[in-house]
Amino acid sequence: MNQDAVAKALLGMAEALRTQDPPKLKMAIKCARSTLSMEISDEMKAICNLQLGKLLFFYTDNFELAKNHLQCAYDKMSAMGTFYTRDKMNAISMLADLHIHYQQWPLTSIKATIRHEITTTRGFPALSNKLMFQLIELMKIDKDVEGAIEMCQLAINSSHADPKMELYFRIAKTLVTYQLMHEEPDISDVTRIGSMIKVMENSTTSDKAHLECIKDFYVCTKLAYMFYEGKSRTSRQLLRQIQKSQTSGETKIHGIRWLGEPSITLLACVMNQICALVQSNTDRVEKYYHLVIKHADEIIFKSTRSPQEPGVVRCINMIKMTTLEMMACCNVLACRPQKTLHNVRDMLEWSNRTSGPLLTRYFTPHIHYILGLQCCYFRQHENAENHFRAAMKKLHKEDITAHNTMALLNLNLAITYLNQLKMADYYEVSENLTAPKISSCSQMLKNNVKLLSAFFAYITNKLNECKLLSHEVLDDSKAEDFFRLHGLGLLLLSLVTDVDEKGVRPTVDWSKKSHDHVVILFSHSLYEKILLAAGYDPKSELMKMVVSEQLASRRMLSVENLTPLVANMPASKLLQWFDGDPFKLLPRDETVL
């Protein structure tokens, strides 16, 4: 038996080990790796490198080694004629996934290689379409707006014979517009997508299940932009649409699929959670939090047994981290610091356990932001400042949402300085929040900057300006149901002009639902003054309730109440973590997941 035959036998053994139940992956990788120590032909070397690269790609965290073997396979197959075209395209597709989902290497070479394959290779439309999607994604990572739009248009033009793929690429073009340009797509593009969907819905030959998947992609693309902008009220119809589209079982789809039904159901849950957070409905946030964590863990567990594409795994990991972050923010407002620190610890643990650097890179600034908020409630102002600055330092400036996140951190740092009347520091930070510098940020952030400006105007005795800005905040927040922002704007307005019972009563009512003790305290205090001025009996049941809520929230907000809640928690040391390895502050045997 020659060496090539032995290598084939070893690859067969590796595949048998991989498909066992349970799989023996380490042994499978050893078998595949051993083939490369043999004297085999270049053709066999290409095949062995591809198989070993695939095993490392799907089943290990050794991305560098996977990349090297896949690159070797691609280079060798490129010189071996058309027989290996499919394998060669699979190799470059996996290399593209590694560059997209782990972002550890320069993108110039992989983009050029994919473009070459797209323009020169024929006969494998599904793989060519996948490579076009991957090239668009790589250009988005590079923030190459022109290149991404150009690639979308090229893909659209090459897909006229396949309406479903044309639709996918047209929707991808709107996604580029939303993510990189932060604006609505051209009306003609939207009209064209709508007309194509209608034609397919009326067609007797169209794949209905696949069409529903494409529609989900379109709706979620639009929803993501609406949530970025803070369009809570106007997103509700689309949110209901994505909920109704979910079914109980996985449907069979031929061709490219955006997300499987379990994943898209999970995405719908987290979008509902975002909507609930914006509307200050803490109980609803917590309800979806438990649902998302349960189902995300189930999907992640299954992915360890049956390989998933990195994009799907990354999506689920991002969803899990996002829901932990939202729950942590709600726990800060509800004066539950012990639960906040549990959420933070879970975020650190999960990003540390999960393959690749992206979760840690993306969410570390968010973790510092949460810890900064919590320090504000402990009146640890210096620690809060340090956390916000640490978040700015660790923020990856090339991320798509980095500009908005940086503005949010500057906003919170400015509020922290203003609360302490550190005016020189406030002026320095507020320079980063001028209208030109936040022009490309979300409308929600701009509204919060407007509230900060109103607060500053009040402190500096510019009462007319404070009144004007407060009214603008109320109008903006009422339009999209930003209940907390509306409540804070109303309370600030009450400092410079009279507010009646009709105006403050809604804030009093929803503040209890939000468990936001800052707003509960101040809204009930204002409500008490209005009722007393209107002649209400201080001993009436209504007045007793108002006073009782004030006292309860004042007690909850007191440092004397908050500090003992975390006094014996090892995770409380994270409040002093600003740099370095956070796990050095924590006992390694503590398990929270």
From Swiss-Prot:
Subcellular location: Nucleus, Nucleoplasm; Cytoplasm
Keyword Ribosomal protein: no
A GO cellular component annotation in the UniProt record: chromatin
Function statement: Plays an important role in the loading of the cohesin complex on to DNA. Forms a heterodimeric complex (also known as cohesin loading complex) with scc-2/SCC2 which mediates the loading of the cohesin complex onto chromatin. Required for normal development until the fourth larval stage. Functions cell autonomously to guide migrations during the development of the nervous system. Participates in the guidance of mechanosensory neuron AVM by a slt-1-independent mechanism. Regulates chromosome segregation in early embryos.
Record-stated family: Belongs to the SCC4/mau-2 family.
Subunit-level organization: May heterodimerize with scc-2/SCC2 to form the cohesin loading complex.
Official protein name in the record: Maternal uncoordinated protein 2
